[in-house]
Amino acid sequence: MAVGDVTMPHMHVVNGVKIGSTEAYVRYPNRRDLVVFKFVEGSHVAGVFTQSAFAAAPVLVSKKHLAESAIRYLIINTGNANAATGQTGVINAQKTCTKLAELAGVESSQVLPFSTGVIGEQLPIERLLDGIQPALQDLKDDAWTEAAFGIMTTDTTPKGASEQFELDGVVYTMTGISKGAGMIRPNMATMLSFVATDAPISQSLVQTLLKTTVEQSFNRITIDGDTSTNDSCIFVATGQAGGVEISSEQDPRYSKILEILQRIMNRLAQLIVRDGEGATKFITVAVEGGENTQECCDVAYSIAHSPLIKTAVFASDPNWGRIVMAIGKAGVPQLDVSKVQVWLDDVQICRDGGAAADYTEEQGARVMAQAEMTIRVDLGRGTAKDTVYTCDLSYDYVKINADYRS
């Protein structure tokens, strides 16, 4: 059961984007599991992908196609990751692009393939290929919610975000979806996300915007510390709402676009954590007082990855010794522990490296019992800060992953 508000918002139509989906029976019966995006000619498309050395076949093909061509289509299947499938997997990903391209009248290099699901099994390629025509016949501009359902695996809820905004008197839209609930620790987490706007943005800035916003969103979440083979995030600017193209970071409209995209990306990333496998609590880990951002990030992830801390949060057990343990093993050079402060929300549990004199277990337990809480750490050695989002670790996480081949 997802934590907090995960309501699917009204998903505004993005001019220049059409979406279709179908039941291809890649793995799941009686549900949409194949999704196609179509972008108007002239759209600018950017992508970032998993840093796993075991990158899946569709990731390899997508990166190659992005470097070669102007992208017109995306095709996404769920239920099978097409990862650790060797050259056959690459050929199958290419076959998918070729079949869609033939039906749509574009080059195969103008198609990006994406897969999510079980690793190590070959795609049921004939079923997938047979599903492409029905998905193309289903193309429409108001199918973002259907697409969000269509890319789910162990997710319990579809994930979406959408905003409309005005720049120089022109109303624009930005809409996106994501999926993921386990195998989530990005550098880039199994995480897929697709965001589009009808604002006019140059190709170079589309890539800059994506890299900038992913760093503080999808690269700042973790559920279980495992990095997927298939992580992919795509940002598209169709330019179909009109206006002069934004081609410089000095353009005053750029900062507004950046702000909105960051908000959309943050929401999509945090929805993944809220829907973490077996999650009952949403945890913000905020670390400040570092000499640099990297050491703050390292400490935050050390806390967020700790199964001892995550199980303590699940049990509402304010065992703060586990938090200082995680700080200590984060590898901060020459950390003066006598300057370290730790809070659970506004309750200080550690002062100057030891137990806060006025802290009581009852105070800590009350915070830990909340559905949402913040673990805040001050390293006392500088002004840098960073934040990571995670969830607790429950019995259900074990059950879900014992029952699901992932």
From Swiss-Prot:
Per the UniProt entry, what is one GO biological process?
Answer: ornithine biosynthetic process
Q: What does this protein do?
A: Catalyzes two activities which are involved in the cyclic version of arginine biosynthesis: the synthesis of N-acetylglutamate from glutamate and acetyl-CoA as the acetyl donor, and of ornithine by transacetylation between N(2)-acetylornithine and glutamate.
Question: Would the keyword Amino-acid biosynthesis be found if you checked this record's keyword annotation?
Answer: yes
Q: What is this protein called?
A: Arginine biosynthesis bifunctional protein ArgJ
**InterPro entries, sorted:** Arg_biosynth_ArgJ, ArgJ-like_dom_sf, ArgJ_beta_C
- The entry marks the following residues as binding substrate, namely 153, 179, 190, 277, 401, 406
Report the active site residues. Answer: 190 (nucleophile)
Its taxonomic path starts at: Bacteria, Pseudomonadati, Pseudomonadota, Gammaproteobacteria, Moraxellales
Q: In which pathway does it act?
A: Amino-acid biosynthesis; L-arginine biosynthesis; L-ornithine and N-acetyl-L-glutamate from L-glutamate and N(2)-acetyl-L-ornithine (cyclic): step 1/1; Amino-acid biosynthesis; L-arginine biosynthesis; N(2)-acetyl-L-ornithine from L-glutamate: step 1/4
A GO molecular function annotation here is: glutamate N-acetyltransferase activity
- What reaction does this enzyme carry out catalytically? N(2)-acetyl-L-ornithine + L-glutamate = N-acetyl-L-glutamate + L-ornithine; L-glutamate + acetyl-CoA = N-acetyl-L-glutamate + CoA + H(+)
